[in-house]
């Protein structure tokens, strides 16, 4: 094998590699020490402050009512996200379709639900029972009282419909990030539209869709605290405040709710990390030596940090 970097001056001795010393950053250590000192001061001050009500905090941290409320919060989060993801995917397809009517309907939906505050929407869903008691179809009348009196269901619908407007843009951006040639190649192989989306487009788009969707899931967990506007108060924040009002101690119960939110959010973040790793299989942002050699051959120049050695054929 021969080195392609050989030239007229190949016989000259190669220079010794530079022994670079890492740059020192004393300012970082000073800043870290200041932050640690301030954090330690705040923690010690808070632990010695009776206004935080640490006895109440310890008494209610694992209370059965709080644990049940945490389960209600998780159920609200998952059901609302499922509704939001499914409806958001449908809206994304409608926006990318060639039908102007479907595009207009999807745009109007996004305009309304992204343009109004989620709290206002939830208040509206809570008042829906006073606006519509029944629906008269002429030949039949549908009673809505039993449906609209289910506050948990209204909370899921309100959160899910709002989330769908944001998921539609996330899904649309992920699909549009896949090169158009992928769709054309799939059609050339005889795949129909649904098979192309399932086997070609979505697996590549998921690498772009998953990170913002994970952020939306975490955001949805915290947004469930707003369903008291419906009103639905059996979730974590509402239940904590009910206990706080009976004890006249809002601070420790707020800390209890915050602790549960932090634990659940941390679990979701770990799940998001491994899910992103799963969909990143087969993709990399670095080039292998063979790819660098091919790039050098295409450009007619060899990168300075790469030595290209031609492959020898294997003997039979």
From Swiss-Prot:
Single Gene Ontology BP annotation: amino acid transport
Main location: membrane
GO molecular function: transmembrane transporter activity
Subcellular location: Cell membrane
Phenotype on disruption: Deletion of argTUV in an L-arginine producer strain results in a faster and 24% higher L-arginine production in comparison to the parental strain.
SUPFAM superfamilies: MetI-like (SSF161098)
Keyword annotations from UniProtKB, A to Z: Amino-acid transport, Cell membrane, Membrane, Transmembrane, Transmembrane helix, Transport
Topology with respect to the bilayer: Multi-pass membrane protein
Keyword Chaperone: no
One Pfam family matching this protein: BPD_transp_1
Domain ABC transmembrane type-1: 70-274
Membrane-crossing residue ranges in chain numbering: 29-49, 74-94, 108-128, 151-171, 217-237, 251-271
GO cellular component, one term: ATP-binding cassette (ABC) transporter complex
Extent of Polar residues compositional bias: 1-14
Segments for region (Disordered): 1-20
Function: Part of the ABC transporter complex ArgTUV involved in L-arginine import. May also transport L-citrulline. Probably responsible for the translocation of the substrate across the membrane.
Assembly, per entry: The complex is probably composed of two ATP-binding proteins (ArgV), two transmembrane proteins (ArgU) and a solute-binding protein (ArgT).
Family as reported in the entry's similarity comment: Belongs to the binding-protein-dependent transport system permease family.
Protein name in UniProt: Arginine transport system permease protein ArgU
Lineage of the organism: Bacteria, Bacillati, Actinomycetota, Actinomycetes, Mycobacteriales
Gene name tied to this protein: argU
């Amino acid at each position: 094998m021969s080195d392609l970097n050989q030239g007229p001056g190949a016989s000259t001795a190669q220079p010794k590699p530079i022994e670079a010393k890492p740059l020192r950053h004393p300012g970082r250590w000073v800043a870290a020490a200041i932050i640690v000192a301030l954090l330690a001061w705040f923690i010690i001050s808070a632990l010695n402050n009776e206004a935080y009500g640490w006895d109440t905090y310890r008494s209610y941290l694992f209370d059965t009512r709080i644990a049940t409320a945490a389960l209600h919060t998780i159920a609200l989060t998952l059901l609302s996200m499922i509704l939001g993801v499914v409806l958001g995917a449908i809206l994304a397809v409608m926006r990318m379709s060639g039908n102007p009517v479907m595009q207009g309907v999807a745009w109007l939906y996004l305009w309304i639900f992204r343009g109004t505050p989620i709290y206002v929407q939830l208040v509206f869903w809570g008042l829906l029972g006073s606006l519509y008691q029944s629906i008269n179809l002429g030949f039949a009348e549908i009673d809505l009282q039993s449906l609209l009196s289910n506050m948990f269901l209204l909370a899921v619908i309100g959160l899910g419909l709002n989330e769908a407007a944001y998921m539609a843009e996330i899904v649309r951006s992920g699909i549009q990030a896949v090169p158009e040639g992928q769709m054309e190649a799939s059609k050339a192989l005889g795949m129909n539209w649904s098979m192309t989306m399932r086997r070609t487009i979505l697996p590549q788009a998921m690498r772009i869709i998953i990170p913002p969707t994970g952020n939306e899931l975490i955001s949805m967990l915290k947004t469930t605290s707003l369903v008291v506007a419906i009103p639905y108060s059996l979730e974590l924040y509402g239940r904590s405040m009910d206990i706080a009002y009976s004890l006249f101690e809002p601070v420790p119960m707020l800390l209890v709710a915050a602790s549960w939110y932090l634990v659940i959010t941390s679990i979701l973040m770990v799940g998001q990390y491994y899910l992103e790793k799963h969909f990143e299989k087969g993709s990399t942002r670095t080039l292998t030596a063979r790819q660098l050699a091919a790039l050098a051959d295409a450009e007619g120049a060899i990168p300075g940090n790469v030595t290209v050695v031609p492959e020898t054929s294997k003997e039979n």
